[in-house]
From Swiss-Prot:
KW tRNA-binding (keyword) present: no
GO biological process entries: translation
Keywords, alphabetical: Ribonucleoprotein, Ribosomal protein
Full protein name: Large ribosomal subunit protein uL29
TM stretches of this protein: none
Gene that encodes it: rpl29
Record-linked PROSITE patterns: RIBOSOMAL_L29
Domain of life: Archaea
Length: 67
């Protein structure tokens, strides 16, 4: 997910997407523990998407404007 896509979302959409990503991360971590996870890079990508969403939400709280 690109930062521009996240910035175009409403606050509610961001929160919903954040919750979806967190649930997916939990499921993938469980698969990794069991040994059924095939795409390990997916965990890293989800963690980065979560960080992007949280960063953009924090920027808006502080009034920092980006492109």
């Amino acid at each position: 997910m690109k930062p521009d896509e996240i910035r175009k979302m409403t606050k509610e959409e961001r929160l919903r997407r954040l919750n979806e990503l967190r649930l997916e991360l939990i499921k993938l971590r469980m698969q990794a523990r069991v040994g059924t996870l095939t795409n390990t890079a997916r965990i890293r990508n989800i963690k980065r998407d979560i960080a992007r969403i949280l960063t953009i939400m924090r920027e808006e709280e502080l009034g920092i404007s980006r492109k």
